[in-house]
Regions:
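Signature of N-terminal electron-transfer/Fe-S-associated modules in redox systems
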Residues: 1-167
Length: 167
């Protein structure tokens, strides 16, 4: 039996029928066409499916869609900002590009959203705090030093309002 849910995704309200057994990642990718949320392991092991639910990182591959009712969800698509009718990358997204922290890109949405939640809680993290925050998001291509440096550079830019420091 389906269950009607109302949720807010990237600032847009939606009312949908959640199907039995449907996960949030499936709802986002297949029904709302938000394919930035990746599905890797479907076991909550890799973190590629991470989204923000009410500001906290959650692995969406095991999160029941019906539990998303009444929640505010942010996907990687929701981090980009509209400035004067033009879409711009969030400073975290820009930092990942500038610091070469992207290779295949599969894990990056989950890592960026995890980092975003970290920087909301702690705008000036240490490298160890960044590492700890990323412990549940796996990357097999880019390597963690570039990812950590990108997050620290974005943190500085967000804190100071200055342009992103290039590597």
């Amino acid at each position: 039996m389906t269950k009607e849910i109302s949720l807010n995704v990237n600032g847009t309200p939606h009312t949908l029928e959640a199907k039995p057994g449907e996960t949030l990642s499936t709802l986002l990718r297949q029904r709302l066409q938000l394919t930035g949320t990746k599905i890797g392991c479907e076991e909550a092991e890799c973190g590629a499916c991470t989204v923000l639910i009410d500001g906290e990182p959650v692995v969406s591959c095991i999160y029941p869609a019906e539990r998303a009712g009444g929640k505010s969800i942010v996907t990687i698509e929701g981090l980009a900002q509209r400035v004067h009718e033009e879409m711009r990358l969030h400073p975290l997204q820009e930092a990942f590009v500038e610091h070469g922290a992207v290779q295949c890109g599969f894990c990056i949405p989950g890592q960026i959203l995890t980092a975003y939640a970290l920087l909301k809680r702690n705008p000036d993290p240490t490298k160890d705090e960044v590492r700890f925050a990323l412990k549940d998001t796996l990357c097999r291509c880019a390597g963690y030093p570039a990812i950590e440096n990108a997050i620290l550079a974005a943190a500085q830019a967000l804190r100071t309002g200055e342009p992103l420091q290039k590597p």
